[in-house]
């Protein structure tokens, strides 16, 4: 509701939203290809109509694609190439590894192979970010991250609700830690900043609202912490996050999902402009686009009947 009202206010003044936030301090935003490979695992790939990833060689090829399209970073999840390639995500649902949330040695070994394949594909310059989600507890995160700490990753991303536990993990590692995408409001973030729990604070702009997100970014700056938006949604969210990133000084990098349904661009009147892995700051008034109601109506939500079958995750 807040973001809709801010859009209306900006439109009434004939300005982009970022002008209401103090103006843009940059004209384009570096992007990282989020969930890289996740949506190309067999079950999801079929829904999107793209060739499925079934081997480490496929990850090498995907890494080359990321590099060739100009992105400066990618973020991946935990994949297991077993009977059927799938995501390992015990922190989200009743699946393998839940509820104990303890990493097995085979998971760590598989992760090393996965990250090595991506590194071979992207080359030495691009950043690789690893999202561990809610998949472990403090001990498990430490076990996994220590085993991967010498790989030169851009960050480990993880979610914990205890700021002291997250701070303990961060101070035990060389690799930066990103977190807090699931937090809401200034008061939710404050104890994590006070505990020096993360290097990069991930802020969800649609969920928090643009004004609250700006306050969180301001508080982060006072603790010398960079900010990155949580943006695995659609184009409207991407544009909201772009205005946010344009206006804050302590911006790190912006998340975006590249693999998606082929009609995604049809849902808005003006999709985000991406060139060589960079997002151009929207120039139109308000958020810079409008919803295409006809296109939305043409693609209603479908109940596939398997929404609660989490045994093999997204794969």
Residue ranges, per PLM feature:
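Shared catalytic-loop signature of beta/alpha-barrel
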Residues: 146-155, 161-290
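Short, small-residue-enriched loops and turns at beta-alpha junctions
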Residues: 80-86, 102-108, 128-139, 155-163, ...
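N-terminal capping/lid subdomain adjacent to the active-site entrance of alpha/beta enzymes
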Residues: 1-127, 135-142, 147-150, 266-315
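Generic anion/oxyanion-binding catalytic loop in active/binding sites
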Residues: 48, 130, 202
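Conserved hydrophobic beta-strand within the GNAT/NAT acetyltransferase core sheet
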Residues: 76, 128-132, 179, 229
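Acidic active-site catalytic centers that drive phospho-/nucleotidyl reactions
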Residues: 2, 7, 75, 131, ...
